[in-house]
A protein has these predicted regions:
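C-terminal helical subdomain
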Residues: 174, 181, 197, 201-233, ...
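Active-site helix of classical SDR
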Residues: 120, 157, 165
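Conserved glycine-rich cofactor-binding loop
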Residues: 16-18
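Active-site loop of short-chain dehydrogenase/reductase
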Residues: 8-9, 80-82, 127-141, 174-177, ...
Length: 256
């Protein structure tokens, strides 16, 4: 069944590039009115023009609660409401644990974890009025499911998002607001593309499906959580990694 979000309003944080842009594109194609929320208003507007379907850009910094409150207020004013929040904004600068500074830790935590809190808190007053409010977090397999060297701070924030989600889903249930999370594996984004073709081939070889994911793969997973078909789903995760977390020994056994 093809999910439709025709006429519903959606805010996507970090929606001007990478996974966020993929989510925004899939939602726009499903008929939603998409607000691209990012610190860089010019980038947001450029993506909105590219998407069409009534999409528009909104300036908002997830590290500031006041900024996110202003952004969600603008989305509500321009759309006449807010039905879906995709809390996607995140950063992942590599840093080895022994060499990591407090400033590096704080930068990742402020964006990925506190930014999720700010985005959700700012959206709640409007989602409550929707009577079918949806929150979709972009988490990761790194942290909640597995580890990856050089991203201790990132993994901690992504695991923290799920702890936040599992408590928030209980508090928000009385408003008929659901909150779920998509856990991407290795997805082709600007960041991964910058690591070179050899690195991409190595990563793809480690995936049972023998390819890297596309941003639209994450967009379609998020679309399910935002759809009416997922009305009875909350506090849950969906891993989208091509089978990457399956132990190599089990994959080898399956191919025997």
């Amino acid at each position: 069944m093809t999910q439709s979000l025709k006429g519903r309003s959606v805010a996507v944080t970090g929606g001007s590039k990478g996974i966020g842009k993929g989510i925004a594109r899939v939602f726009a194609q499903a008929g939603a009115i998409v607000a691209i929320v990012t610190r860089h208003a010019d980038q947001a507007e450029a993506v909105a023009r590219e998407l069409g379907h009534g999409a528009f850009g909104v300036s908002g910094d997830v590290t500031s609660l006041a900024s996110m409150e202003a952004a969600m207020r603008e989305v509500n004013t321009r759309c006449g409401g807010l039905d879906v929040l995709c809390a996607n904004a995140g950063i992942f600068p590599p840093a080895k644990l022994e060499e990591m500074t407090s400033e590096q830790w704080d930068a990742v935590s402020d964006t990925n974890l506190k930014g999720t809190f700010h985005s959700v808190k700012a959206a709640i007053p409007y989602l409550k009025k929707s009577n079918q409010g949806r929150i979709v977090l972009t988490s990761s397999i790194t942290g909640p499911v597995t580890g990856f060297p050089g991203w201790t701070h990132y993994g901690a924030t992504k695991a923290g998002q799920l702890g936040f989600m599992r408590t928030a889903c209980i508090e928000l249930a009385k408003y008929a607001i659901t909150i779920n999370a998509v856990l991407p594996g290795n997805i082709i984004t600007e960041g991964l593309a910058g690591m070179g073709e050899e690195y991409q081939r190595t990563m793809a070889a480690s995936v049972p499906l023998k390819r890297l994911g596309h941003v639209d793969d994450i967009g379609h997973a998020a679309l399910y959580f935002a759809s009416k078909e997922a009305a009875y789903v909350t506090g849950q995760t969906l891993i989208v990694d091509g089978g990457q977390i399956i132990p190599e020994s089990l994959e080898a056994l399956a191919q025997a």
